[in-house]
UniProtKB/Swiss-Prot annotation:
Protein name listed in UniProt: NADH-quinone oxidoreductase subunit I
Native species: Bartonella bacilliformis (strain ATCC 35685 / KC583 / Herrer 020/F12,63)
Domain of life according to the entry: Bacteria
Protein task: NDH-1 shuttles electrons from NADH, via FMN and iron-sulfur (Fe-S) centers, to quinones in the respiratory chain. The immediate electron acceptor for the enzyme in this species is believed to be ubiquinone. Couples the redox reaction to proton translocation (for every two electrons transferred, four hydrogen ions are translocated across the cytoplasmic membrane), and thus conserves the redox energy in a proton gradient.
Cofactor annotation: [4Fe-4S] cluster
Gene3D superfamilies referenced in this protein's UniProt entry, alphabetically: 3.30.70.3270
Binding site for [4Fe-4S] cluster 2: C73, C103, C106, C109
Primary residence: membrane
Bilayer-spanning residue ranges: none
Source lineage: Bacteria, Pseudomonadati, Pseudomonadota, Alphaproteobacteria, Hyphomicrobiales
Any GO MF annotation of the entry: iron ion binding
């Protein structure tokens, strides 16, 4: 009996008709892709993108040269040189370099920082033509922090209940 039913389905081309209607249903459904350079997709507040050094609202850099980020980095992509202690007993960095070629974007540096100085910001479009441009120094990191501070602060605030 099942052979007879199978022969009838084949004769009436039911599989073809089912496939045709499935294709038509998908053809008129909304497209799942976006037109990337002109449209941006959703980026989570936990996204780990381009690194940035943050400043306090008074303009002073946050990094206290504790070197925890350098110690915890599994790729050894961070190099820090601390300056001499200032009159108030605090230290600041003289050199803060990140080799973005080595970085694996794990976020350990951000988690280890006690003053939220080093963060991975929301920027994911930092492709370059020269490899040397992926060696970030302190000035480049501070510029990134200044450029993305509003979004970085919002992302940290949104993630605060889970820390």
């Amino acid at each position: 009996m099942s052979g007879l039913i199978q022969a009838a389905k084949s004769l009436l081309l039911l599989e073809f008709v089912d496939a045709f209607f499935l294709a038509m249903r998908q053809f008129f459904s909304p497209k799942p892709t976006i037109n990337y350079p002109y449209e941006k997709g959703f980026v989570s507040h936990r996204f780990r993108g381009e690194h940035a050094l943050r400043r306090y609202p008074n303009g002073e850099e946050r990094c206290i040269a504790c070197k925890l980020c350098e110690a915890i980095c599994p790729a050894q992509a961070i190099t820090i040189e601390a300056g001499p202690r200032r009159n108030d007993g605090t230290r600041r960095t003289v050199r803060y370099d990140i080799d973005m070629v080595k970085c694996i974007y794990c976020g350990f540096c951000q988690e280890a920082c006690p003053v939220e100085a080093i963060v991975e910001g929301p920027n994911f479009e930092f492709a370059t033509e020269m490899r040397e441009e992926l060696y970030y120094d302190k000035e480049k990191l501070l510029l990134n922090g200044d450029r993305w501070e509003r979004e970085i602060a919002r992302n940290i605030l949104m993630d605060a209940p889970y820390r």
